[in-house]
Swiss-Prot record:
The lineage of its organism: Bacteria, Bacillati, Cyanobacteriota, Cyanophyceae, Synechococcales. The gene is rsmA. It comes from Synechococcus sp. (strain JA-3-3Ab) (Cyanobacteria bacterium Yellowstone A-Prime). Specifically dimethylates two adjacent adenosines (A1518 and A1519) in the loop of a conserved hairpin near the 3'-end of 16S rRNA in the 30S particle. May play a critical role in biogenesis of 30S subunits. GO terms for molecular function: 16S rRNA (adenine(1518)-N(6)/adenine(1519)-N(6))-dimethyltransferase activity; RNA binding. S-adenosyl-L-methionine binds at residues 11, 13, 42, 63, 88, 104. This is Ribosomal RNA small subunit methyltransferase A. One of its GO terms (cellular component) is cytosol. It is an enzyme of class 2 (transferase). CDD domains: AdoMet_MTases (cd02440). Its main location: cytoplasm. InterPro entries: KsgA/Erm (IPR001737), rRNA_Ade_diMease-like_C (IPR023165), rRNA_Ade_Mease_Trfase_CS (IPR020596), rRNA_Ade_methylase_Trfase_N (IPR020598), rRNA_adenine_dimethylase (IPR011530), SAM-dependent_MTases_sf (IPR029063). Keywords: Cytoplasm, Methyltransferase, RNA-binding, rRNA processing, S-adenosyl-L-methionine, Transferase.
Length: 279
């Protein structure tokens, strides 16, 4: 078995119990005449791939490591439901067939990969029914966090706009070879088929990111770069939110309502808004 390469952020998941938990979390349909298609990002040596194929599905595996591609081609040479794509997932178009996605991904690429498979509030990706990812534990906490939590931030709100997130299991460093320096977790994202839309998703995104950019400040001050204090204060009062509210105290419906109300009152600002980045 090849040794994991640091430049690709590789850590082989060696715990079979975690492999099985990932397969169960994907909720694969039973074998049928027209098998389901699963996208696997970074199959590595094919341990998870083998378990997926055993469920009777097609697996489209995207692998950037040329040596691993040769290993995978040899390992699954007699498996007609295995489809290998060599290349950088972030530079390739999404293969059209898969409606399910599983991945044990490099943690430094989690943000860009999430954006590619979920999209953004302004441009949601509607391809996948379920997405099961191995991520750093701290990120899993951010994805799951709700109002009032220290982990709750712009990413929490933006992902919640697009999908429901569930924690499947925590994974210790000892489950990998070599062990990473952080704890991990498996999460399942279920994209919303029709998210409750903000009237202007770009404005919504920018407002959320601006609010959390100064999370210790009250919103009347934190949103000052976009909207004047008096307008924010009036909107909070109209929505029956505390005049001293901070970004971390608002849940998704609150942010949607505030975004739409401020859009009515500051149309010129919204018209020139660009989509913010998660923090």
């Amino acid at each position: 078995m090849p040794y994991p390469r640091k430049r690709f952020g590789q850590h082989w998941l060696k715990d079979p119990a975690v492999h099985e938990a990932i397969v169960r979390a994907a909720q694969l349909p039973p074998p049928q005449r027209d098998p389901a298609w699963v996208l696997e990002i970074g199959p590595g040596t094919g341990q998870l791939t083998q378990r997926l194929l055993a469920q009777g599905v097609h697996v489209v595996a995207v692998e950037i490591d040329r040596d691993l591609c040769r290993l995978l081609q040899k390992r699954f040479a007699d498996q007609p439901r295995f489809h290998l794509v060599e290349g950088d997932f972030l530079r390739l178009p999404l293969p059209p067939q898969p409606r399910l996605l599983v991945a044990n991904i490099p943690y430094n690429l989690t943000g860009p990969i999430l954006e590619k498979v979920l999209g953004s509030p302004a441009q949601p990706v509607r391809q996948f029914e379920r997405i099961v990812l191995m991520v750093q534990k701290e990120l899993a906490e951010r994805l799951q966090a709700g109002p009032g939590s220290k982990a709750y931030g712009a990413l929490s709100v933006r992902v919640r706009y697009l999908a429901e997130c569930e924690l499947i299991c925590r994974v210790p460093p000892s489950a990998f070879r070599p062990p990473p320096q952080v704890e991990s977790a498996v999460v399942r994202l279920t994209p919303r088929p029709a998210p409750t839309p903000a009237r202007d998703p770009r404005w919504f995104s920018q407002l959320v990111c601006q609010g959390f950019s100064a999370r210790r400040k009250q919103l009347v001050n934190a949103l000052g770069g976009l909207v004047d204090r008096q307008t924010v204060a009036a909107a909070l009062a109209q929505l029956r939110l505390s005049p001293t509210a901070r970004a971390e105290e608002l849940d998704l419906p609150d942010w949607l309502a505030l975004s739409d109300l401020l859009l009515e009152q500051t149309p010129r600002m919204a018209a020139v808004s660009g989509e913010g980045k998660p923090r």
